[in-house]
């Protein structure tokens, strides 16, 4: 598969983001910051991105979509849109989790770090990034009271949480140090699309996480 003209859909956070990789190193992006109103804007945002950059839907070669974890409704909107386009255009689609997307550049930039994504008010999806690759099966659901003991001395990256509180003894990674970008999803997703890592439409689902007695998660 060509890695040109690949569409990205990330609806896992409060910000709806779409991206378009037209060639190596040439990426266009668009966002909508009307918090969690993704269903209203996703089709229009994709259409505008393609139109402004002279790409017709029929020219797309693949789709990359965020599988989260994150907003339940937002993820369903993004996955449904990606699947519908992939089926209509007969092109492959690859799901990439937020943890997987962040890992390569975050590890190069900061070293070992913990990523946190809000689940409920005081619960978080968490994962330790200690290499450029991350296995999404290692995500855990933890309470805010557990963060210090789980990640002692390890920098924390709260995703889409500008109000995340300071925790004594732990360092928060500042936005100027690292912010998750469209390119992070596109880089990994394009690798999968070119290889054999694309997903079947039937099995591609958001990354749902349930807590079990040991704290480990099941997808």
Where is each model-derived feature located?
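Phosphate/pyrophosphate-binding loops at sites that engage ATP/ADP/AMP, CoA/4′-phosphopantetheine
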Residues: 46-62, 149-154
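Short, conserved micro-motifs enriched in small and acidic residues
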Residues: 36-40, 72-76, 180
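DPxDG-like acidic metal-binding loop motif
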Residues: 62-98
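Short, well-ordered amphipathic alpha-helical segments that serve as non-catalytic structural scaffolds
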Residues: 38-53, 99
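Oxyanion-binding and handling regions
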Residues: 1-27, 33, 37, 94-219
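Short amphipathic alpha-helical face segments that pack within enzyme cores
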Residues: 41-44, 80, 84, 101, ...
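Recognition helices and adjacent regulatory flanks at domain boundaries
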Residues: 21, 33, 51, 55-58, ...
């Amino acid at each position: 598969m060509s890695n040109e003209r690949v569409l990205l859909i990330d609806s896992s956070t409060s910000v709806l983001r779409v991206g378009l990789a037209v060639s190596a190193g040439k990426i266009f992006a668009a966002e909508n910051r009307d918090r969690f109103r993704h269903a209203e804007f996703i089709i229009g945002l994709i259409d505008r991105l393609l139109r402004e950059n002279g790409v017709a839907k029929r020219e797309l070669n693949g789709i990359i979509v965020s599988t989260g974890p994150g907003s339940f409704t937002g993820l369903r909107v993004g996955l449904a849109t990606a699947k519908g386009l992939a089926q209509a255009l007969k092109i492959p689609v690859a799901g990439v989790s937020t943890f997987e997307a962040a890992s390569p550049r975050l590890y190069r930039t900061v070293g070992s770090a913990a990523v946190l994504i809000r689940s409920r008010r005081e619960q978080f999806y968490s994962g330790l990034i200690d290499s450029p690759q991350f296995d999404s099966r290692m995500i855990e659901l933890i309470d805010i009271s557990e963060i210090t003991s789980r990640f002692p001395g390890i920098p924390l990256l709260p995703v889409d949480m500008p109000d995340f509180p300071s925790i004594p003894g732990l360092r928060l990674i500042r936005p100027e140090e690292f912010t998750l970008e469209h390119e992070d999803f596109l880089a990994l997703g394009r690798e999968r699309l070119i290889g054999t890592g694309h997903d079947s439409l039937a099995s591609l689902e958001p990354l749902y996480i349930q807590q079990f007695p040991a704290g480990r998660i099941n997808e």
